[in-house]
Amino acid sequence: MKKKILFVASEFASGMIPFAATAINALAKDDRFEVHCLCVNSGIYSYRNIILQEANPVFLEYPKSKMMKLFYKLWPLEIIKHLSQLEKSINPDAVHFLTGDFTLALYICLNNKRTFYYTVHDLHPHEVVRKTLLGYLMQKYIIWGYKLCRNIIPNLTTSSYFQLKELKEIYPCKKVKYTSFPSLITSLIINGKKMPLEVSGLKEYILFFGTVDKYKGVDLLVDAYCNLTCKSLKLVIAGRGFDIETHNENIIRINRFIEDEEVAYLFKKAKFIVYPYRSATMSGVLSLAYYFNKKVLASTIPFFEDNACLLYTSPSPRDGATS
């Protein structure tokens, strides 16, 4: 008898989509499981092209109006309706919330079951810059939702050994398991041949790739690069996020969503990759560098230290990044 697994992926950040899709597809190809999944798309951030049909996907669309987006974050009625229907029709042996899924915190609180599983991504919140009061309050609500989910759900998983130890100490009565971090490599990345126009004509460069947030230390990287006496390679910062005042013609800022089809070109042309994170529990960007066989300069945070083949530097002083 096959085990029936229902995966839920209600969040669609660029790194979250391949994380969830890889896990879903892996079990969908395993004869021991009957897999179903409920995934939420938002425009270009979509699961549609990477989830296998064997996973029996149900796709929902994130609302477009500001008012409906707010309602979605508080009580995502469409997700709850479809989730309830799937639970009744499938009668799954496990329901696994893969992507943080803070919008479902109240639903989980009211309907918690021993068959629920929850992937913990960041036990400790990242340092994030919010420019408005609404943004600040929403960030607090998101953090509260994550905490409520992991406090209530009886089965937790993580892809960080450092976090695994801490979770077991905090929740001694819960089942806490380690799962390997899924690769972010998708077929669109593997077969992609699209060249980002911003790097047209460049033969080699130093690359930072990923969403630009404060905790990722991109400002430290920029300062360190500007302090170099020899700038034989340009610095490319590729990924949507807060903008950085550089006033340096050798720094190329690609502040937009990077399509999967563009990733291969960016990595293949890079001399090496830099990840100067101040903090992070887990990060899938390493799988991209490994796949394209690129050297990585990374800060000494626990998740990076769990992985071999890295050159480490201090995550805080600018001198460390410069060296």
Segments (PLM) and residue ranges:
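Short N-terminal targeting/anchoring amphipathic segment
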Residues: 72-75, 83-104, 115-117, 155, ...
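Conserved small/polar residues in nucleotide/adenosyl-binding loops
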Residues: 312-321
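Acidic donor-binding loop of glycosyltransferase active sites
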Residues: 265-282, 291-294
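Conserved donor-binding/catalytic core segment of Leloir-type glycosyltransferases
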Residues: 198-216, 222-225
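Membrane-proximal helix-turn-helix segments that form the acceptor-binding/catalytic region
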Residues: 84, 136-156
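An aromatic- and histidine-rich active-site surface loop
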Residues: 45, 79-80, 95-113, 118-120, ...
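N-terminal strand-loop element at the rim of the active site
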Residues: 10-14, 26, 30-73, 103, ...
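Nucleotide-activated donor-binding/catalytic signature segment of Leloir-type glycosyltransferases, i.e.
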Residues: 244-264
